[in-house]
Amino acid sequence: MTEVINTNVMSLNAQRNLNASQKMMQTAIQRLSSGLRINSAKDDAAGMAISEAMTAQIRGMDQAIRNANDGISLSQTAEGAMQETTNILQRMRELALQSANSTNNSDDRQAIQQEITQLQAELDRNAQNTQFNGQRVLDGSFQNASFQVGANANQTITFSIGSIMSSAIGGIASQTGTAVSGAAATDITISLGGGAPISINSSAGFVGPDASQDATSAYAKAAAINGAGIAGLQVTAVTAGTQTVGPIGGTAGDTYNLTINGVAVFTNTELSTALSNTQLRDGINSVSSQTGVLATLNGGDITLTASDGRNISVTESGTGFTAGTDGLTVTAGPFAATLRGNLTISAINSIAIGGTVATLGLSAAIAKDTLGVNSIDVTTTAGAQAALLRIDSALTSVNSNRAAMGALQNRFDLTIANLQNVEENLSAARSRIQDADFAAETSNLTKGQILQQAGTAMLAQANSLPQSVLKLLG
């Protein structure tokens, strides 16, 4: 081996190895102190790019989870206020039922209406004052709200909350038709809200005990529809007609015969003095339990009403009596022929009627109106009955909104669970790329420390070797 002093190759080799072991120690210490395998792009350029993309997703999902939790809070706020709305509507329904009872007089119903009015105002106050982060959520303005529930663009849940203002809930489909036809109602179908049609049995199967309640009457047709038991649908029937009364009697020898629905009201009654409208009314009402017909006076007019929708048939004759001029059955009057009743049909959803609709005097399609529970008036029995249907419609609307809020909360819960699962798996994947392996790095640190100590000792030995050349000079 050549002995030289200008170039100490062994020293250079020892220095290089010492630098390498020092770099190993620095890398190990950096990774152990930071916990990361990748501390800069030079550690793993591709790995850094992948891990940073994963970090963006993970942080995005963290925020998405917070957004979804905010959505749950909002829907809970809305649903809680709707519960109070439901309570108010239930109280209004109780009051309407109370007012519908005939034991109440007009003063009682006025008092009930006063409470109804206060409850209507409370419905609106509740809807207007329910807010989340300054936004009203129940007055109909919270529409197409978008919740960002993903780490990327357009990963959203969009929903709207319908208004529960008193003017916006309680719409019903209702119609009072023209007089029913003189044919039985057959092959009728009815559907509500676009649902499946329900067949209605022929009115021939719902005749009443009186001949005036035959299959052609509004009475039988209403009974047939109500007999189908369609939830949320009600049908009532009333027969009524008003006629200006022609003169009856007033001359010696005049007699008068009046029959209503086959029941004799006057039979060969001598009327040398003209029969007054009051006497006519009282005579008709004296047999109302048999005819089902009540008479009321309005000036010179008389109104006959059958509250159950039975037909009203009037027959008159007598001495000194001129048909078509005298009495009730004057030409073109309602009682010149059999008077048939009208049906009033109401439902909480739109109504579609198929089959022989003309026999009912109703339209084939009846849409919901735009009135709400703010329009109800229970100061009459009829108003109280109508109020019940509107309140039921309002309850259906509110309960539908509440169900939507419950479904939304469940959806947010599932979204959060999915985000947490994806975030967990993505974090594990990022960890495998980015995080330091402490076992390996501790081993590398120990190895570097040993090599550092050995390298330092060997460098000292290598640096002392050129001195052996001095022995040759001695």
Swiss-Prot record:
The lineage of its organism: Bacteria, Pseudomonadati, Pseudomonadota, Gammaproteobacteria, Legionellales. SUPFAM superfamilies: Phase 1 flagellin. Its main location: secreted. Keywords: Bacterial flagellum, Secreted. It comes from Legionella micdadei (Tatlockia micdadei). The keyword Transferase does not apply. It is found in: Secreted; Bacterial flagellum. Belongs to the bacterial flagellin family. The keyword Secreted applies. GO terms for cellular component: bacterial-type flagellum; extracellular region. Flagellin is the subunit protein which polymerizes to form the filaments of bacterial flagella. Gene3D superfamilies: 6.10.280.190, f41 fragment of flagellin, C-terminal domain (2.30.220.10), f41 fragment of flagellin, middle domain (2.170.280.10), f41 fragment of flagellin, N-terminal domain (1.20.1330.10), Flagellar export chaperone, C-terminal domain (6.10.10.10). This is Flagellin.
